[in-house]
């Protein structure tokens, strides 16, 4: 398993916990909005920042389709 995949799993599980949602629901929402690959590809940015920064960026991606920064 790649570092990117490990981090993606860590990210989605922790994001779901933070939002008090089942992980499967978070993944389904990200898939419906076409965000899975974009979030996965953001590994270089997300893994070097506070995890809360990733959450904020994902929220913005979900609402606007654009990265926060």
Model-identified regions with their sequence ranges:
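Charged, low-complexity, helix/coiled-coil-prone segments
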Residues: 1-7, 40, 49-51
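Charged/polar, solvent-exposed surface patches and flexible loops
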Residues: 10, 14, 28, 41, ...
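Long, compositionally biased
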Residues: 43-69
């Amino acid at each position: 398993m790649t570092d990117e995949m490990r981090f993606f799993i860590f990210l989605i599980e922790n994001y779901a916990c933070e939002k008090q949602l089942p992980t499967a629901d978070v993944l389904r929402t990200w898939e419906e909005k076409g965000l899975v690959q974009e979030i996965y590809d953001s590994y270089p940015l997300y893994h070097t920042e506070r995890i809360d920064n990733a959450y904020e960026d994902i929220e913005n991606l979900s609402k606007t389709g654009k990265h926060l920064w």
